[in-house]
Structure formats: structure tokens, C-alpha cells
């Protein structure tokens, strides 16, 4: 495993305050597009906990761009940002597929998919742990190494998709690939998903990969650029539609306030990628606020 090294130059380089606007506008626009243009599926694989089929309204090929000055946090729906970071670290930092490792961090988002052996099968972290042929490193260390030594390469790709072991996975990866691009010492990230639960997964994943971009950029001596979150099949489920309509309406009623809200993120990068924890990132005054709606969406399995 590569050793993490913080940038030289003291605390100012490793403890950052990042300010920007929320991405409510982009997110709500996507929900409205999906509501208007989406098509209901007819024979879904997914079911709710009660055994009923979970029908989804689906669209095709939508990308949300998170440019500099935008932070993927919302005020029309509360984001549980600590759990999202814990899951990210479980996959990318620990490269684990053991559900107990995530539970030890106080996060239970994978409990429904735990197999008899206590894992989620050969998925997510297990794929990142695989060795890359030309370096013998795991996929994460290989990415960090190549971004330091071959920045202009157009092959900085990390993949979670494996056609040889998909049958062993509790859930085939939704986010299945990332591509990293360096432009003028800035690091850009494209995230590709095969399937995106727009109500539950998308806000969670967009925040995760924005955080990952900050971490990998710092680890490789680059400045974070933009994030493109590309969804092949964005969708929401039938039991999500009413709450989605409430969220859209809430945003429209509070648009002026929400669009002018400033998001302030504090992130401590001093311990490097492998020392970073969920406690090293905070959204100023976010968790304490009672005017950010908590929205409940049933999980489809």
C-alpha cells in the first residue's frame, strides 16, 4: 500500500475551507425531467421489503456537472453526509467487502445485502483490491501512482465491473467506473453509473465522489477540478413519487433562499488519503439546522 503524504507548507495546505452553492437547482431540474420524460418499467427485478414489486420510472443518459463553485449538498432534502463518507472509505480506502467493517464505523447501508459469509460477495471494495497487471498494485494505489508519474495519460480508469464474477456479487455495482483527467494541474473526475436511484442513491453518491475527488487530488499534489456524474438509467420508484413531488414543490417555494445559500465545507487532509476519517469533514451549520427537510424513501432490493 502506498503511504499517504500530506502536502508541504503547513496547516493551510492540509486544512481547507471550501465554499460554494448547493446543487439543488441541478438536482430538481433532473427530477422534473425524469418525471416528465421517464417511462415506467413493466417487469422489475426489484421488490420492497413487503414483497411487492418496485416499479420504477426510468430515463436514459443524464449527466450532472458539479463545477468549481458548486458543492453537491442540498437544502431541499437533508443529506446524511457522514454515512456517505463512511461507505466511500469502506470501498476505496479499506477496499473491503465485509459488511462488519462498515458496521464498525456505525454505518448500516449494506445490511440488506449481506450474504451468509458476512460479505457482499466479490463486489465494490473487493474489485478495488485486485492487482493491476503492469504495477502489481491494487487499483487505488495504482491510480495514485499513475496520477503522480504519468499525469497526461488518458488511461486513468478504475473499474468495479467484472464479468467473470458478477454472479458472486450481492449487488452488481451501480457506480461501476471512474475516469480521472488532469488539465493544467487540476484533477477532474467522471463517474459512470449503470443504474441510479435518483431519490436515494444519487445525492449520496454525488457527495461521496466529490469528497473522493478532494482526497485524491490532495494525495497526488493536484488541485480539484470538476466532477461529471453520468447516469445511464436514472430512475425513481413508484413509492418515491409523492415525496419527490413534495421536494420539487418545496424547492420552488423556497427557490430564492436556497439558490443563494452558501455551503461551507471544512476538510482536514493532514493525515493523507489512508488516514482520513469521516470526522475530518464537516458541513458548517448543516446538521444543526431544523429547516432542511428529512425525506424518507423506501429501499427497493
State the predicted function of each range:
Residues 2-301:
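Terminal, non-catalytic protein-protein interaction segments that mediate quaternary/complex assembly
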